[in-house]
Design a protein with these regions (language model features):
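Conserved G1/Walker A P-loop phosphate-binding module
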Residues: 1-62
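Eukaryotic intrinsically disordered and solvent-exposed regulatory patches
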Residues: 2-4, 36-38, 48-50, 74-78, ...
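Beta-strand-rich binding-surface signature
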Residues: 13-16, 49-51, 59-64, 85-89, ...
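Short coil/turn segments at secondary-structure boundaries
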Residues: 30-34, 45, 67, 76-80, ...
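Amphipathic alpha-helical interaction motifs in eukaryotic regulatory proteins
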Residues: 30-34, 68, 82, 86, ...
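Switch II (G3) loop of P-loop NTPases
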Residues: 56-77
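Inter-motif core of Ras-like GTPase G domains
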Residues: 74-101, 105-118, 124-128
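Conserved GTP-binding G-domain of TRAFAC-class P-loop NTPases and closely related GTPase folds
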Residues: 95, 109-219
């Protein structure tokens, strides 16, 4: 009975949230998933949503929601949509990652210790975008660096926790007494390399096969 109740609550959540910093490529990725076509994008200041069909018979779909990445807006929009999230795609700029790693980890930390996210445990994909660029970091390196930064953040924040879990106590990231890794989280976390632009530029196809397979799986 409990399992059916949990499954029922999960099936009522149909949104896949696209999160990430500004210029990570969320909006182009959103457009590519929906139309397959390249389009010029600008920094978003509001959300965009659309139905994404997962099968040819159109019987399975989710609602893709692209949320702004600007620092002053992103938590506000996460607050608005987090309860509806069946899954989260956290988009990372693989080219700028080394420079932005602290900011990326900071935002991801805020997502991961959110009480609603911890309670609902939506599937999480870290989409390592812009892999068409030679200087892009690999998904493996990005995972290692994020785990290291999140572990550091956990230590520095533990002295003054500001986030409460569903029981009213301070939210704990990972397992106490152990270095953080993503396997310690209540949700399943996967990494994928992708390119919303594609290796052939504006005229070619995007490289989103791994992301598209993941969307089918979590739907």
């Amino acid at each position: 009975v409990i399992w059916r109740f949990v499954q029922g609550r999960r099936s009522s959540r149909k949104a896949v949230l696209l999160l990430g910093l500004c210029d990570a490529g969320k909006t182009l990725l959103f457009a590519r998933l929906l139309s397959g076509k390249y389009r010029d994008t600008q920094t978003s200041i509001t959300d965009s949503s659309a139905t994404y069909r997962l099968s040819r018979d159109k019987s399975t779909n989710v609602t893709l929601i692209d949320l702004p990445g600007h620092e002053s807006l992103r938590l506000q929009f996460l607050e608005r949509f987090k309860a509806a999230a069946r899954a989260i795609v956290f988009v990372v700029d693989s080219v700028a990652f080394q420079r932005e790693v602290k900011d990326v980890a900071e935002f991801l930390y805020q997502v991961l210790v959110d009480g609603t996210v911890l309670r609902n445990a939506p599937a999480l994909l870290i989409a390592c975008n812009k892999q068409d660029v030679t200087m892009a970091k690999s998904a493996k390196l990005i995972q290692q660096q994020l785990e290291k930064e999140l572990n550091t953040l956990r230590v520095t924040r533990s002295a003054a926790p500001t986030t409460l879990d569903s029981s009213g106590g301070p939210a704990q990231l990972g397992k106490k007494g152990k270095d953080f890794d993503f396997s310690q989280l209540p949700m399943k976390v996967e990494f994928v390399e992708c390119s919303a632009r594609g290796s052939k530029g504006e005229e070619g196809d995007a490289d989103l096969e791994g992301l598209e397979k993941w969307l089918v799986k979590v739907a």
